[in-house]
UniProtKB/Swiss-Prot annotation:
It is found in: Plastid, Chloroplast. GO terms for cellular component: chloroplast. Carrier of the growing fatty acid chain in fatty acid biosynthesis. The modification O-(pantetheine 4'-phosphoryl)serine is found at residue 37. 4'-phosphopantetheine is transferred from CoA to a specific serine of apo-ACP by AcpS. This modification is essential for activity because fatty acids are bound in thioester linkage to the sulfhydryl of the prosthetic group. Keywords: Chloroplast, Fatty acid biosynthesis, Fatty acid metabolism, Lipid biosynthesis, Lipid metabolism, Phosphopantetheine, Phosphoprotein, Plastid. This is Acyl carrier protein. It comes from Cylindrotheca sp. (strain N1). The keyword Chloroplast applies. Residues 2-77 form the Carrier domain. PANTHER family: ACYL CARRIER PROTEIN, CARRIER DOMAIN-CONTAINING PROTEIN. Pathway: Lipid metabolism; fatty acid biosynthesis.
């Protein structure tokens, strides 16, 4: 498991108040982790801060699973 995934799982678990074991790569933020639209906005903002990246609005709406977020973060880090 990559360090990025571990950090992301910790962030998601804390932000959404869910058991870390439920934060799998295929977990959907809304359907499986119980996030509403405000939770997702706050989660995106926390990810931006913690990973020092910007997530453009048109991409933010496409990030629905932990894997989506991980892919986006890793791509942004590679671009730096």
């Amino acid at each position: 498991m990559s360090d990025t995934l571990k950090r992301l799982q910790k962030i998601v678990s804390e932000q959404l108040s869910v058991d870390p074991e439920k934060v799998t790569s295929t977990a959907d933020f809304g359907k499986q982790l119980g996030a509403d639209s405000l939770d997702i906005i706050e989660l995106i903002m926390t990810i931006e801060y913690e990973f020092n990246i910007d997530i453009e609005d048109h991409y933010a709406s496409k990030i629905t699973t932990v894997q989506d977020a991980l892919n986006y973060i890793e791509n942004k880090i590679k671009q730096k």
